């Protein structure tokens, strides 16, 4: 990739507040000049005028936050302010937004259009900075905008054509120069308990006055207001049950994984705004355990990425197509040098927080499901990685994860995840919410006994066989590890309500060699995206080919999978095979017609599922764990992750994506012994193994 060489050393963020204020004052002066008189060619005047106007609006918001006047505003005034921040990218206006790469490409040509769309999107990251008092986040983006404006102004004055390479070069060095800043405000924020913006907002606000939501700078939809109102009216004992299940799951995860919780000093809470009563109880629970709580909100940007599910406390998504369009903006700049620089940024920022990272216990995550279905619209104008960049991106993800684990100690890191519905799930929202609370609170001990019956059967097999029915083409042979001491060893983990709430699965890391066949699901939602007739071919444990039927063009279908399941790795190992046992959740989903909207945490418990990528024990394979019956879990690795000591760069992929087959598409699951005899666990979507009869009661009652 061609970029202009830069002779000076990287611009490091100034140490003094005075320097930052000086840069900011100069930048605002430049933005005012850009707004007052346009010196670019006519073609670009409206673009830069709109960017300047947005920046000046950001200054007004930052001022209202700084002087406290925002807290004197009425609820309707705050709604209007919030709307003006995000209206440009909502579906009603996105078609003619300068953040839309299709629109800008049509106006300015593809190369410049993509770059200017990136710039408009990056400028929007100042919203979060304005509300958090992050002057650096504002000044670096103002300076970038002014630098690009200067290129266009000079070209107009000299009556010469704009050269995209100069625009790209300025943007490239912006991404490179501020790699540390980007890491600090994305990856490292999970361990940084010194950032108290979100913590204080949640713990100190009057939650009966929902104006507090608008002090975040996040997009506050009617759905988030509805959520906050619903949580506010719940009985205290129900909120306590929700939060206690969450925090106890985190604590029990350490016991289940045989990890030393006494070395942990902090936990990172993530989720959507609107659940503040829940968060308050969870924070208090964690603090009673002796943990500090890190909570942050980070804007989508070239540094944090444009993920549909963000790793922080976040607001509503004003337009998922916007995030989809910008998810590979880095393709505009990515080369080997930038990969190295970004890795340097991660390490440098973690060095600043080495002590906090060393005592970090992991994330406690609240996920939302039930939002309106999103079917992305693909276009050739959207930035996309080329083949070489796909390799670089995959390599970066793996190395970045490794860099994080040089500071975060895996031997005392755990997690927990719980999910609740969004009001968008439909008119039965409250009934569905109550049902999910019940499902999340199901008795672990009862399921542990039932699941042990399944494990005892599976442990007799040398492989498992899974077949679909009624048009589902699944036909998989999954090889299992040899149990050299069956009396004291097991292949499958007995998973109840600890790290993955709710209860209901047994899982293993398959032996890759000999694992072959086809995985097929008629319709499945994965990380917010729908896949129709998803099909993955598995050879020697590796996903080697794939397709779906979302688009008329199969090349576009394959790209959807490559981008969001394969993550540009070309091939991925089957990192997990599991059998979900939560038939109550399955029946509830059918009752309310929300199967397609279930979060993967619940969906994976409603049938067998397979994950491609790393195993469930990624970077923790050498930590011995045991099931409740005292048997050691030996299936913690495979032939790929076995390379972790000899060739660590080849051992991990930095991804793990679950794909579930619903019971009604399931013909059979059988364990096959060495002599060829079979133990049937599920037949025609029903549990038939002795000891599992209880699981069918939910089916029979429906």
What are these regions (language model features)?
Residues 497-535:
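Conserved AWS/pre-SET-to-SET junction and N-terminal core of the SET lysine methyltransferase domain
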């Amino acid at each position: 990739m061609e970029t202009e060489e830069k002779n000076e050393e990287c611009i490091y963020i100034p140490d003094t507040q005075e320097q930052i204020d000086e840069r900011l004052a100069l930048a605002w002066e430049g933005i005012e000049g850009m707004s007052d008189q346009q010196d670019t060619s006519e073609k670009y005047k409206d673009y830069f005028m709109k960017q300047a106007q947005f920046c000046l609006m950001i200054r007004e918001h930052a001022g209202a936050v700084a002087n406290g006047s925002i807290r004197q505003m009425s609820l309707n005034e705050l709604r209007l302010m919030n709307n003006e921040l995000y209206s440009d990218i909502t579906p009603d206006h996105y078609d003619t937004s300068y953040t839309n790469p299709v629109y800008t490409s049509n106006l300015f040509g593809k190369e410049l259009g993509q770059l200017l769309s990136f710039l408009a999107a990056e400028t929007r990251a100042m919203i979060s900075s304005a509300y958090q008092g992050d002057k650096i986040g504002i000044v670096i983006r103002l300076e970038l905008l002014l630098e690009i404006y200067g290129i266009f102004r000079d070209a107009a004055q000299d009556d010469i054509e704009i050269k995209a390479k100069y625009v790209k070069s300025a943007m490239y060095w912006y991404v490179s120069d501020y790699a540390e800043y980007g890491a600090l405000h994305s990856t490292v924020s999970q361990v940084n308990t010194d950032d108290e913006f979100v913590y204080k907002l949640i713990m100190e606000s009057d939650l009966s006055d929902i104006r507090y939501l608008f002090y975040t700078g996040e997009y506050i939809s009617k759905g988030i207001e509805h959520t906050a109102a619903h949580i506010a009216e719940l009985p205290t004992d129900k909120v306590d049950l929700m939060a206690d299940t969450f925090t106890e799951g985190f604590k029990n995860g350490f016991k289940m994984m045989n990890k030393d919780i006494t070395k942990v000093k902090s936990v990172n809470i993530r989720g959507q705004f609107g659940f503040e009563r829940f968060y308050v109880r969870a924070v208090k629970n964690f603090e009673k355990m002796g943990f500090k709580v890190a909570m942050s909100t980070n804007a989508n940007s070239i540094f944090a990425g444009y993920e549909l599910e963000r790793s922080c406390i976040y607001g509503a998504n004003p337009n998922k197509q916007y995030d989809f369009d910008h998810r590979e903006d880095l393709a505009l700049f990515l080369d080997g040098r930038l990969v190295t620089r970004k890795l340097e940024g991660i390490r440098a920022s973690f060095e600043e927080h080495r002590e906090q990272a060393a005592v970090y216990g992991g994330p406690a995550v609240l996920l939302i499901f039930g939002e309106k279905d999103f079917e992305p619209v693909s276009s050739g104008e959207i930035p996309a990685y080329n083949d070489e960049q796909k390799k670089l991106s995959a390599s970066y993800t793996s190395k970045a994860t490794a860099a994080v684990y040089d500071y975060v100690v895996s031997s005392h890191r755990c997690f927990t995840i719980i999910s609740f519905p969004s009001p968008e799930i439909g008119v039965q929202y409250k009934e569905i919410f109550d049902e999910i609370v019940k499902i999340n609170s199901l008795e672990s001990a009862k399921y542990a006994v039932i699941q042990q019956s399944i494990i005892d059967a599976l442990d007799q097999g040398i492989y498992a066989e899974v077949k679909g029915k009624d048009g589902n083409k699944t036909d998989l042979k999954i090889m299992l590890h040899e149990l050299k001491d069956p009396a004291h060893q097991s292949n499958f983990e007995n998973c109840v309500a600890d790290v993955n709430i709710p209860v209901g699965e047994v899982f293993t890391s398959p032996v890759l060699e000999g694992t072959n066949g086809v995985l097929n699901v008629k319709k499945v939602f994965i990380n917010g995206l729908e896949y129709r007739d998803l099909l993955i071919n598995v050879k020697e444990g590796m996903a080697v080919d794939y397709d779906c039927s979302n688009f008329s063009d199969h090349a576009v279908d394959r790209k959807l999978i490559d981008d969001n399941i394969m993550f540009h790795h070309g091939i991925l190992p089957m990192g997990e095979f599991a059998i979900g046992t939560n038939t109550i959740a399955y029946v509830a989903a059918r009752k309310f017609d929300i199967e397609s909207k279930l979060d993967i945490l619940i969906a994976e418990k409603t049938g067998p599922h397979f994950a491609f990528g790393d195993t469930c024990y990624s970077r923790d394979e050498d930590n011995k764990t045991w099931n409740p019956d005292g048997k050691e879990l030996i299936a913690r690795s495979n032939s790929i992750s076995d390379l972790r000591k000899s060739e660590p760069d080849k051992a991990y992929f930095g991804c793990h994506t679950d794909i579930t087959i619903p019971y009604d598409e399931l013909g059979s699951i059988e364990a096959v012994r060495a002599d060829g005899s079979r133990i049937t666990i599920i037949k025609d979507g029903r549990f038939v193994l002795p000891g599992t009869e209880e699981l069918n009661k939910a089916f029979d009652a429906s």
